[in-house]
Amino acid sequence: MFTLHTKERERIMKAIRINETGGAEVMHLEEIEKPTAQAGEVLIKVAAAGINYADLMQRQGTYLTRTRTPMTMGFEVAGTIEALGVGVTTPPVGSRVVAFGAGGYAEYTTALAATIIPIPDNMSFESAAAFPVQGITAYQLLHESTHLQAGESILIHAAAGGVGTLAIQLAKLMGAKTVVGTAGSAEKLQLVRELGADAAINYKDADWAEQVQQATGGKGPDVILEMVGGDIANKSLQILAPFGRMVIYGAASGERAEFSGIQLMYKNQSVIGYWLTAWMSRPDKTAEAAKGLMQYLASGKMRIIVGNTFSLHQAVEAHKAIADRKTTGKVVLTV
């Protein structure tokens, strides 16, 4: 019977892989060769990996960029530094870090040393893995895309999700006068209220748009964070306040939104697109967002909502739970 020698075994790791695009069932736990830190990189022993809706789209082959298979899933991880590549001197081996690491659904991954973020001693790996993608997204949606101002009102769709739960708190910290969040269940609406939203509205209600207008004093929200698409996006633009800004950072429904250029002109409104991957080409801005988030988290002014955790071999179940809208906050895989 063939068995791997100890040294050979040390070069092997477990990872969630896809060999084709499709439903959650195309993901499989496989044994592959452990990566090696190249120049400018660090090798990370993964303790937790965050799951984002973009992961589902990538798995389905519907993401903004082409899904190249075979591939290891995942994009953000928290863990400890196992080894340093050539030219890397800090942080030292053994440091607790969070990073953007392609192939994060695995026991090990590599990341550029310049992009890693130290984890405070009082933060768990699960919480750390929950904030990079969605935290930086929430921060940049408010600071860079819409430039939310103190005293303004904001509508946050999918407010009980990873981005939404952080955006509610950030908007309040930035001085928003009225924060309105939408969600699809009583449990999620309760979470939205607990995080500080002034109004929590069920998007399944036929008159949800009218409820938003009422909550904003009849004017409509000055800022809208939109990631659903289709009719939700269309109605959102209809109630956007004059001189308002609506940023689109997803299309979870898969449905096309249709906007009137005449309306945008008449009401001096703006519709803005946001894609984190493109912002990664501006590491100064990414670092600025990460630093701002860490300051809020370390001070206790913000908290990360880790709603559901699954083990690595439960990646299929985790993706299905997100697709079925059965989760709140951030979904994390533990390794």
Say what each PLM segment does.
Residues 208-218:
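Short amphipathic alpha-helix with an adjacent loop that forms part of the alpha/beta core around
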Residues 218, 299-308, 316-335:
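C-terminal capping/lid region of NAD(P)-dependent oxidoreductase domains
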Residues 57, 68, 90, 96-160:
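NAD(P)H dinucleotide-binding glycine-rich loop of Rossmann-like/cofactor-binding domains
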Residues 2-12:
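Short, Lys/Arg-enriched N-terminal segments with co-localized hydrophobic residues
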Residues 158-159, 228, 251:
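NAD(P)H cofactor-binding loop motif with strongest signal on the N-terminal glycine-rich segment
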Residues 129-205:
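Mid-domain Rossmann-like dinucleotide-binding core that forms the NAD(H)/NADP(H) cofactor-binding site
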Residues 33-50, 62-103:
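Glycine-rich beta-strand-centered segment in the early N-terminal region that forms part
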Residues 176, 187, 192, 231-302, ...:
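Glycine-rich phosphate-binding loop and adjacent beta-alpha segment
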